[in-house]
Amino acid sequence: MNNKVESYIGFSIRKGAAVFGVDNITVTRKHVHVILHTSSLSPKSLSNLCFFAEKIGVPIFCVEEFDILQKKNCKAIAVCDKSLAKAIIENLK
């Protein structure tokens, strides 16, 4: 199941429908559909991310540290494609 989520994240990156990092996510002008973060995200960044997710009304999930995120040295990613976000949400529930 987690391989599917990692694949969907890869698809969104290749499509250009992903935003990396807490700072970039909170200031993006793209329409965010789901936010994913790793467990190693700092508490302050996590609170900023949760506040932003609640403000715009999108789900936020904690995921494993996938290879894709480790290569980018990234702890948070937002998916801006509606269909990919829906597939990720369904696989994480």
Residue ranges and their predicted role:
Residues 4, 44, 83:
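Charged, alpha-helix-enriched surfaces in structured cytosolic catalytic cores
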Residues 4-34:
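N-terminal first-folded block
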Residues 20-22, 59-64:
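Short amphipathic beta-strand starts and helix->beta connectors
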Residues 22, 39-40, 80-81:
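Fold-independent oxyanion-binding glycine-rich loops
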Residues 27-62:
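N-terminal positively charged helical leader segments and presequences
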Residues 65-93:
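C-terminal structural segments of small proteins and small subunits
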